[in-house]
Amino acid sequence: MYKKVKIIHVDMDCFFAAVEMRDNPALRDIPIAIGGSRERRGVISTANYPARKFGVRSAMPTGMALKLCPHLTLLPGRFDAYKEASNHIREIFSRYTSRIEPLSLDEAYLDVTDSVHCHGSATLIAQEIRQTIFNELQLTASAGVAPVKFLAKIASDMNKPNGQFVITPAEVPAFLQTLPLAKIPGVGKVSAAKLEAMGLRTCGDVQKCDLVMLLKRFGKFGRILWERSQGIDERDVNSERLRKSVGVERTMAEDIHHWSECEAIIERLYPELERRLAKVKPDLLIARQGVKLKFDDFQQTTQEHVWPRLNKADLIATARKTWDERRGGRGVRLVGLHVTLLDPQMERQLVLGL
């Protein structure tokens, strides 16, 4: 069923917080989080495991995190240090394969199908990479090994922290039978709730469904859901991959009809956009930022502004203009925010010009 492909997904454990604890051992056993401050509103980028015991999580508003853990130590973040560590980790990957697809500073896909290291064993390569990262950077990583990308990503989360999980081609069918649909990358809370209302909780449930029905109900997402439930993922590890945008969106359980509701959603989405952008672009330089609205008739519209840095006030103003001019009385079922990243060549020109 599967091509002889060996994919590893490596995911660093609470990466930003781990770098801080490594560089300041006094932080190691106390709850810490990166992002926000006690004086200003913000969002948690990463929390260490002592903080997670109190319920503190990534993308959580700082105020909520402090309510859960009043003695939480908040750190502003040192993105130069994180980028330096990320570059070192990527260099370690390159010792084993040239087929590396970075997803952010702290995770990447590796295709080790043709690697001669460790007698060609992807399991042993993953173990050796994790050990090398620890030996050279004193940081831990988790890894997943599988014949397709989405399963490798799911597997890397199975034995966190500092562990790995392997799904061989022969084990895929049994693994999928009981895999919750919410574990599939791209299946959010709203989609999972709709699927559960249809009696679909696991990939095994979807395997019994008619593809045409899923396409009618969910469109393109229905096909992806059906394919993933069958273990199908045709995407190759793309070492030329250049991330062009970062976005975040929310599909509402019920359509909204008032601007105040839309503005409140943007206020909640913005910190998550800020967090995601910081993971891939710590200096936060961008080319454009914009908004997306999807209406109750499934038509959608986007509007963008040229803007050098992420700016919430401009996003809200752009969304208000879009709401007033393009909604036409329709209900809104999805609100999204996104940024377009600078082309590397253009960015170099800007830096040289400073």
Swiss-Prot record:
Enzyme Commission code: 2.7.7.7
Cofactor note: Binds 2 magnesium ions per subunit.
Binding annotation for Mg(2+): D11, D106
Reaction(s) the record says it catalyses: DNA(n) + a 2'-deoxyribonucleoside 5'-triphosphate = DNA(n+1) + diphosphate
Site, as annotated: Substrate discrimination: F16
UniProt cofactor(s): Mg(2+)
InterPro entries noted in UniProt: DNA/RNA_pol_sf (IPR043502), DNA_pol_Y-fam_lit_finger_sf (IPR036775), DNA_pol_Y-fam_little_finger (IPR017961), DNA_polymerase-Y (IPR050116), DNApol_IV (IPR022880), IMS_HHH_1 (IPR053848), Rev_trsase/Diguanyl_cyclase (IPR043128), UmuC (IPR001126)
CDD domains: PolY_Pol_IV_kappa (cd03586)
Pfam families named in the record: IMS, IMS_C, IMS_HHH_1
Function according to Swiss-Prot or TrEMBL: Poorly processive, error-prone DNA polymerase involved in untargeted mutagenesis. Copies undamaged DNA at stalled replication forks, which arise in vivo from mismatched or misaligned primer ends. These misaligned primers can be extended by PolIV. Exhibits no 3'-5' exonuclease (proofreading) activity. May be involved in translesional synthesis, in conjunction with the beta clamp from PolIII.
Family: Belongs to the DNA polymerase type-Y family.
The protein's name: DNA polymerase IV
Gene name of this polypeptide: dinB
